[in-house]
Amino acid sequence: MTESKGRAAEVEAQKWRAFIAIAISFVTMVFSMTMVFVALSAIADDFGVTLGAVSWVVIVQSLVISALMMPMGRIADMVGRRRVHLVGLVLFAAGSLAVVLAPTFELMIAARVVMAVGNAMGQAVGTAMIVAVFPANERGKALGSQTSVVAIGAAMGPIVAGFVLQALPWEALFLMLLPPLLVAFVAGYRYLDEAVVSGAGAGAGADAGHARPDFDWGGATLSALAITALVLTVSNPLAVGWTSPTMVVSVVAIVVLTAAFISWELRQPEPMLQLRFFTSPTFSMAVTSRTLGFVGSTAVMFLMPIYLISVLGLREASTGAVLFLTSLGMGLAANQAGRSSDRFGERPLFVAGFAIHAFTLAGLALLGQEVALWVVMALLFGNGVALGLWNVPNGSAILGAVPSEHLGVVGAFMNLTRNLGNVLGQALASAVVVGVMAARGFDIPLSKIGANPGAVTAFLHGWRIAYAAVTVLSVLALALAWLTRPTPGSPPPLAPLPASAVGGVRPRPT
């Protein structure tokens, strides 16, 4: 009995050691993504470039991560998730150091590309490794703990960056990333077991003499091109008109590349992403509601700083403290939601989460110039709680609908839906507010709104339209969440698609 308890305790300890090793890398990578927003002005001044040019520091990161995440997830499923994780940490650290040493802005952007490749590798495998380390009946707890870690990293980024930049140059922020990355690498090398984190049928098995499937280079290329076209079109870094020939060509390119990707994947015996997953109502509805949820969440975080500073007159430090409430609510709710979903199932929690999400968005749509700050703070905290409540069980439902050997690419696809939701949410909020203001004669930078009472009124009109739009999207996500019926236990095996659907090539059963 004592020996049995000892083994159980050691298994529990190994599980949490592996989680901590992965969590350190998650915190560092997410921290790096949010800290850079605070440093953009300093970077622009140092290199003597415009704020429009320095925005590529962020854009190139979104492009590379979004384009490479699914291919990296599939590669990890084939060659081993631990390998991809460790190589990603090395690339991320090398890119961070190269950013500091870059003598020109162009080389600094190239270094950011290297960082983003490492970040994509880390995001692609992190979720899958955590789910693989924990037993199926603790999947919610695992994802809840992961989401809390992400919330911590996201919240720490702008706060720490603000303090550091008061005393040190912007390069110090990237040097700060190196010590935790070293710790994450050593911990990952020591505590991550490839056979455990890759699971049965993944890369670990390839070393034992099992046949390794061919990598779907065509699918990876087409998906990367389609996602790159989508991110560039929606983010519109060149500020071209939405009816301009450039924009029309971009939209056509998105449609053509997406159709080509789907056609290609359906014809492959070993596709990068099994499109048959979408025949599962649980998978397809959970993925759609997840994307809609992140569109609404990003709209909040994009417009809220402008509202707090330009409309309510808060200082930057106070604004950061108010915005922290969203991350606090998400972190607290995610941890509890994960544990509760293991006991009571995913559906009640993500239905409740989307309901609260829609309520808080509707409340934010009603805000004006004369509002008590505590009302704003309560709505932001509630929005964070909602995000924590629906995010974790929603992810658990998605991962629970696919076989374990596909967790890498599906975990990467989950993170991709978050990134695309973020891009779409920011684009929607910006397009609505800027469009309404321009229609009222205020074609000015958002940072200069507070100096003009008429501009404030126009901004608030656009604000209400934008939040009304994302409230509608959140209600749609709530309806999908209500219809989602996650299946407990292991997912059923995938049935092959009819030969007619794949041009006569029948995919190999998985």
Residue ranges and their predicted role:
Residues 1-14, 196-211, 451-454, 482-510:
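Intrinsic disorder in cytosolic terminal tails and internal cytosolic loops
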Residues 2-191, 337, 344, 352-358, ...:
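Transmembrane-helix bundle of Major Facilitator Superfamily
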Residues 9, 185-224, 266-281, 342, ...:
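Flexible interhelical linker loops that connect adjacent transmembrane helices
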Residues 16-31, 36-38, 51, 168, ...:
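12-transmembrane solute porter fold
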Residues 45-46, 232-243, 309-314, 369-371, ...:
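Membrane-interface helix termini and inter-helical loops of multi-pass transporters
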Residues 135-136, 194-198, 210, 234-248, ...:
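Alpha-helical transmembrane bundle and helix-membrane interface signal
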Residues 178-198, 224-236, 253-268, 477-487:
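C-terminal membrane-cytosol helix-exit motif in multi-pass small-molecule transporters
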Residues 445-461:
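Short, membrane-exposed interhelical loops at transmembrane-helix boundaries
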